[in-house]
Design a protein with these regions (language model features):
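Transmembrane beta-strand segments that form the barrel wall of outer-membrane beta-barrel proteins
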Residues: 82-85, 174-186, 211-219, 245-257, ...
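Outer-membrane beta-barrel channels and translocator barrels
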Residues: 202-208, 243-247, 273-275, 315-317, ...
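Bacterial N-terminal signal peptides
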Residues: 35-47
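Outer-membrane beta-barrel initiation region
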Residues: 54-237, 299, 433-439
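Outer-membrane beta-barrel translocator/channel fold
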Residues: 219-228, 260, 280-313, 324-336, ...
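Sec/Tat signal peptide C-region and signal peptidase I cleavage site
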Residues: 48-52
């Protein structure tokens, strides 16, 4: 009897111990589950926060490098960066540096990324990256993976509302333009030469606008007349750049131009869906004006000049072909053909023109070659904490050779100091893509 009672007591104790252990195990499991859930929640929270900081980190790095008008935004479809290269003399180099930074620290995870490049706060091109997943992993992004196009997608409407860092507005640039002119009109001398150093103040007060005030300082003048011996103003202009839907770009410039002209000039370019092809148009209403020192003499009568044509860009060789019908300053009307090949540090090509004067008489054919070269230094610009004007040589300089020595017909003007064949091609998508791939 005693043994039976003792056995029952032992069994009860064992059952109580098992119940205690089960309760302890359940409590321990619940505690561990709570801890794991909390850790997972914190990890997800910090991951989202880290993802948001990634775009901001890339923006801050670009600002430190000297890029202006920098910002970013993101939605469910893609992440978008906006930037303007004010740090490097060449757009291709600057855009390539920006791509490297964004690839390193600013790409979203498993989502497309777009970079919209501005010029004077006006969107020019976009670079688009689409990540490719292979075997449950994402390949490392490289420069060759970015598509370059005039197309901004649907991102610009959202990106234009973003508050940009390091604004380019109200910042003063002083660019010194070395200007060389040559002519061969006499037998006993090979060339007459004119060499000027022409500093220009450039500043923007609102989006797309640029004010240019240039002073021409003669260094050497042999054969170009007494007026060129005097210090006098050069370009005094206000320009407004704009972009319309369907890849239409334009620029309106008013003021005092070169070649002794003043007035207004409008340029409009349209790029087809096949971006190798484009339509080009230009309209000018100008009069004669010249400076004697700082006194301006002008004729109030105005004349119309115009140009309309098309262009084709050969991406394999970075070569631009254009054919245009034009009316020049002496009211002669004709056609002009140009072929320009663009390299990283220069652009060079030739041109040919044939026309008739205002009375219908044939004007002799003229042509020649032209080139534009990048000026040193080839590195970065520097702005001293935005307190002082940034002083540099102009990005490039060029010459036009008149093979038939035509002095009267086929004359034209340059509306803005920075207008040249190299600058006009600086945002060409095919050229930017070649810069990304080759350098």
């Amino acid at each position: 009897m005693f043994r039976t009672v003792y056995s029952i007591i032992c069994v009860r104790k064992m059952i109580e111990k098992m119940k205690y252990r089960r309760a302890y195990i359940q409590k321990h499991l619940i505690t561990r589950c709570i801890k794991i859930t909390a850790l997972l929640f914190a990890f997800c929270l910090f991951s989202v926060k880290g993802l948001a900081q990634t775009g901001e980190q890339a923006v801050n790095t670009l600002v430190e490098m000297g890029f202006e008008n920098v910002g970013w935004t993101e939605d469910d479809n893609e992440r978008v960066y906006v930037l303007q290269n004010s740090a490097y003399r060449l757009q291709g180099v600057g855009i390539g540096k920006a791509v490297d930074v964004i690839q390193k620290m600013g790409l979203p995870e498993r989502k497309p990324c777009r970079i919209i490049v501005l010029n004077n706060n006006v969107p020019q091109i976009s670079l688009y990256y689409q990540p490719i997943a292979v075997a449950d992993s994402v390949l490392q992004a490289e420069r060759k993976d970015w598509d370059v196009s005039y197309d901004l997608g649907g991102a610009w409407e959202q990106a234009r509302k973003v508050k940009l860092k390091n604004s380019s507005l109200f910042k003063i640039d002083v660019l010194v333009y070395p200007q060389v002119a040559l002519k061969n009109l006499v037998i006993n001398q090979i060339y007459h030469v004119l060499f000027d150093l022409s500093p220009a103040v450039e500043v923007s007060f609102w989006k797309g606008m640029k004010l240019t005030a240039q002073l021409k300082i003669p260094v050497y003048n042999d054969g170009y007349g007494e007026l060129e011996d005097l210090v006098h103003p050069g370009h005094l202009t206000v320009s407004q750049r704009f972009r319309l839907p369907y890849n239409i770009f334009g620029k309106l410039t008013v003021g005092h131009f070169n070649a002794g002209r003043y007035g207004a000039d409008l340029e409009v370019d349209y790029h087809f869906k096949d971006e190798r092809f484009s339509l080009l148009g230009r309209l000018g209403v100008t009069g004669i004006a010249y400076w004697r020192g700082f006194t301006c003499h002008y004729d109030p009568s105005m004349h119309l000049t115009w140009s309309v044509g098309g262009g084709f860009y050969w991406p394999q060789y970075n070569t631009q072909f254009t054919l245009k019908a034009e009316q020049w300053l002496m009211k002669e009307i004709g056609v002009k053909f140009e072929m320009i090949r663009h390299f990283r540090y220069c652009s060079i090509g030739f041109y040919a023109m044939k026309g008739r004067d205002e009375f219908g008489n044939s004007v002799k054919t003229n042509g020649g070659f032209r080139f534009q070269v990048l000026l040193p230094h080839y590195g970065k610009y520097k702005r001293y904490k935005n307190k002082w004007p940034r002083i540099n040589l102009s990005p490039n300089m060029g010459l036009v050779y008149n093979a038939n020595n035509e002095q009267y017909y086929y004359q034209d003007y340059k509306a803005e100091t920075s207008d040249n064949i190299m600058e006009k091609n600086s945002f060409n998508p095919y050229f930017i893509k070649s810069e990304l791939l080759n350098f």
